[in-house]
């Protein structure tokens, strides 16, 4: 598969493997990767050396690798780091899609670099890469209201209304991936943050 090198060469969607976690808010990043595979005709394959399910797709002529780490959220950096090292992908060319409790359900925000905000998947990726200089695609799943309820909240399934909002957000995010690969960050932000 030959394609142009896009601004982002690796898109990682974070989540937890296994049927116990399928459909939970914490797996929003997995859902985005699944949507990109569906849209662009890829096939996710288990890649033990990369610690995840991986696909390679052409998106508007841009060659892009997708990964769903199968290491559980707290060790997501193992998959992202392995792919980045093997394919010589710098942190600036990595986009990480993840659930975000500080955004309401259905909202999407792009962010370059920054802290992990308490998100263990981001924390591990940042530690593995040795830098926070990767981009994030934040998929809002809402906050439960109290910090003691955060873990049960993200590890549970959204309500039917929240699920519809989250699915719409994932569609909106997937619509902007070609722009992001083309380096049109500001335009994608305008569309998603409006």
From Swiss-Prot:
Site, Stabilizes the basic form of H active site to accept a proton: residue positions: 99
Binding site for tRNA: 21, 72, 74, 120
CDD domains reported in the protein's UniProt record: PTH (cd00462)
Keyword Cytoplasm appears in the UniProt entry: yes
GO BP terms, alphabetized: protein quality control for misfolded or incompletely synthesized proteins; rescue of stalled ribosome
UniProt keyword annotation of Cytoplasm present: yes
GO cellular component terms, semicolon-separated: cytoplasm
Coiled-coil spans in chain: none
Catalytic activity: an N-acyl-L-alpha-aminoacyl-tRNA + H2O = an N-acyl-L-amino acid + a tRNA + H(+)
Pfam family, one: Pept_tRNA_hydro
Site label Discriminates between blocked and unblocked aminoacyl-tRNA, positions: 16
EC nos: 3.1.1.29
Compartment(s) of residence: Cytoplasm
Molecular function (Gene Ontology), one example: peptidyl-tRNA hydrolase activity
Root EC class: hydrolase
Alphabetized UniProt keyword annotations: Cytoplasm, Hydrolase, RNA-binding, tRNA-binding
Highest taxon above the source species: Bacteria
Active site annotation, chain numbering: 26
Family to which this protein belongs: Belongs to the PTH family.
HAMAP family: Pept_tRNA_hydro_bact
Protein function: Hydrolyzes ribosome-free peptidyl-tRNAs (with 1 or more amino acids incorporated), which drop off the ribosome during protein synthesis, or as a result of ribosome stalling.
Subunit structure: Monomer.
Protein name: Peptidyl-tRNA hydrolase
Organism: Halorhodospira halophila (strain DSM 244 / SL1) (Ectothiorhodospira halophila (strain DSM 244 / SL1))
Lineage, opening ranks: Bacteria, Pseudomonadati, Pseudomonadota, Gammaproteobacteria, Chromatiales
């Amino acid at each position: 598969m030959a394609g142009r090198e896009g601004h982002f060469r690796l898109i990682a969607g974070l989540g937890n493997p296994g049927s116990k976690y399928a459909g939970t808010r914490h797996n929003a990043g997995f859902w985005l990767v699944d949507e990109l595979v569906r849209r662009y005709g890829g096939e996710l394959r288990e890649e033990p050396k990369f610690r995840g399910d991986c696909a390679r797709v052409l998106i508007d002529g841009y060659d892009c690798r997708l990964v769903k780490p199968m290491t559980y959220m707290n060790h997501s950096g193992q998959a992202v780091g392995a792919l980045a090292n093997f394919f010589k992908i710098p942190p600036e060319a990595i986009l990480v899609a993840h659930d975000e409790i500080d955004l309401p359900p259905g909202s999407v925000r792009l962010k370059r670099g920054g802290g992990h905000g308490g998100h263990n998947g981001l924390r591990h990726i940042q530690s593995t890469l040795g830098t926070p200089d990767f981009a994030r695609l934040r998929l809002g799943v809402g906050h439960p209201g109290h910090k003691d309820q955060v873990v049960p909240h993200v590890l549970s399934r959204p309500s039917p209304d929240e699920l519809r909002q989250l699915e719409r957000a994932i569609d909106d995010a997937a619509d902007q991936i070609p722009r992001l690969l083309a380096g049109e960050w500001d335009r994608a932000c305008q569309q998603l943050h409006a």
